[in-house]
Every structure is written in C-alpha cells, then in structure tokens.
C-alpha cells in the first residue's frame, strides 16, 4: 500500500485537512504533505517495515498548520515514523500522539514540532526503539510539553526542547539499556 512514494508526496492544500489512513501489511509507504491552517488526522498501521513521512506546513504557502491534532498508531517491527509540524511557521496549538502497540520492536521515530503550545505524547511498547525528538518555538503560556512513556528494553532517546519558559518533560521508561 502506498500513499505518495519515496520521491513525491501526496498533498492536501486548503484551510482544513481531515485525514484518516489505515494500512495493513508490510512495507507500506505514506509520504504526505499538508499545507493549510488546520490538520486533524489518524494513521493506523499493522505490519512491519512501514515508512511514514507526514509533513504539516511543508511549504508555508497556506498558513502555518497552526492547529494540528495528529495520531500515528502502529503495531509491528522496523517501522520508520517521521512527523514534522509547523515547518515554516510556528504552530499555535499542537496535540500529537505516536503510539506503538505491544510487540513493536526496532522502530525509529523522528518528530520535529515547531509551536507555541506543543503537546507530543510518545508511547511505544517494544524493544530496541530509537526516538529523535525536537520541539522548538516560543514557549510560555503552556508551551513545549513532551510526555514520553517507554516499555521494553534498549531505547535510544534524543530530545531537544527550546524556547522561553513552559518547557515541561514527563518521562517514564522501563527495561534496560536506555540511552537518553
């Protein structure tokens, strides 16, 4: 199953985008760009070796993806999840969840969020996962929030948060060999 491909993304352009994608099987690809003021969506994956690259405000032509509510949920191994929100302009309200169900091993999650009020929850229940998280933008009045939960062994987590004030991280890990 493919939405977009490795070199060309599918695109939604307009004020509001609502997107729901379910993919079952191995080696699914989602490469999607959203250019607009508001994004609400859910991506559900079942299978191994899936590749998701979701960009909200990738060109900056139609607002800033100012409001985004994104959920990416998967069960499977060796998935590559890349979520970028507010790439060219700081978003004002972001609520994003990345959830790996029990048995989700050897996954890579990269999330770059640029926003004033950014809530990013990552919950993955599996072993040997790698997280690269960058939350940027102006903090203050409930800005920069990361809630991370990890169950399983061997997690490599890199988190960068920046801005002024409101930099909150809640982190729970379980298992051995966590490199944070």
Q: Which ranges hold each PLM region?
A:
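Low-complexity repeat regions of mature extracellularly deployed or surface/particle-associated proteins
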Residues: 1-180
